Curated annotation (Swiss-Prot):
It comes from the Eukaryota. Can form homooligomers. Interacts with KCNA1 (via cytoplasmic N-terminal domain) and KCNA4. Keywords: Endoplasmic reticulum. Inhibits potassium fluxes in cells. May regulate Kv1 family channel proteins by retaining a fraction of channels in endomembranes. This is Potassium channel regulatory protein. It holds the Pfam family BTB_2. It comes from Mus musculus. One of its GO terms (biological process) is negative regulation of delayed rectifier potassium channel activity. The lineage of its organism: Eukaryota, Metazoa, Chordata, Craniata, Vertebrata.
Length: 264
């Protein structure tokens, strides 16, 4: 392979060598424009095209040009800066992928309010993500067992969904509705896939917390009740970040990158 088959770029002091076809993957980009003379901002110095941009982030851009997918380290935190670099190079596909990444990686917050009052326990679950609330609503069932004198059949409890005041919260409660079990109904809570029907508020709280943990949430804070109160609040957070963002187009594998030491 001759030197004419390669292009060397000095991006912010870091040297990258690749094929012209790699830089022309997206013909409308400024990287393609620097090779065909459309973009006069980039100058050739000592056989290298100088680009006054972030060299460390350019390695991710070059990898995207090679494979048409973006693979970032798990601890990568410069998504906005990388998107800014993609905007500079006019790589619209990469800008769109990063916008998708930032949208998908937004954190979801859940608040569980728990009030233990006499023989009943009341729950209110608030979520920033309505889809998570919808998922919980489909898994939580309240079973209302009425006294035998009213129903004649104690073994056929009435199944009810939790209340949905809005798209972002749900309400339910469990326990006995009266001082004596034979005077009023008893509400049990079941949370799928667990088949148990629980009436004790503390047990239901434990099952609800376990359900959220299995869904990828982690507990970030708690608020203990003030003196004379019995309400508690548990705050959970879940951050989902895709590891690989790819385009629908089949990646090309013909490109090669050969980094060289930085020149002073």
């Amino acid at each position: 392979m001759s030197g004419q088959d390669l292009v060397t770029l000095n991006v912010g002091g870091r040297i990258f060598t690749t094929r012209p076809s790699t830089l022309k993957q997206f013909p409308a980009s400024r990287l393609a424009g620097m090779l065909d003379g459309r973009d006069q901002e980039f100058k050739t110095v000592d056989g290298q095209i100088f680009v006054d941009r972030d060299g460390a982030l350019f390695s991710f851009i070059l990898d995207f040009l090679r494979n048409h997918e973006l693979l970032l380290p798990s601890d990568f935190a410069d998504h906005h800066r990388l998107q800014r670099e993609a905007l500079f190079y006019e790589l619209d596909s990469l800008v769109d992928l990063l916008s998708q990444f930032l949208l998908q990686s937004r954190s979801a917050v859940m608040e569980v309010h728990f009030l233990n009052q006499n023989t009943q326990a009341f729950f209110r679950v608030f979520g920033s993500c309505s889809k998570t609330i919808e998922m919980l609503s489909g898994r939580i069932t309240m079973f209302v067992e009425r006294p035998t004198a009213l129903t004649g059949n104690r073994n056929s409890p009435l199944a009810l969904p939790p209340q949905r005041p809005s798209h972002h919260d749900l309400l339910f409660h469990c326990g006995s509705d009266g001082a004596a079990e034979n005077q009023a109904g008893v509400r049990y809570i079941s949370i799928k896939p667990d088949n148990r029907k629980l009436a004790n508020g503390t047990n239901v709280l434990g099952l609800l917390v376990d359900t959220l943990l299995k869904e990828g949430f982690h507990l970030v804070s708690t608020r203990t009740p003030a003196s004379g109160e019995k309400s508690e609040c548990y705050v959970f957070e879940r951050i989902t970040t895709p590891q690989v963002l790819g385009m629908s187009k089949t990646p090309k594998s013909e490109t090669t990158t050969m980094p060289a030491p930085s020149q002073k």
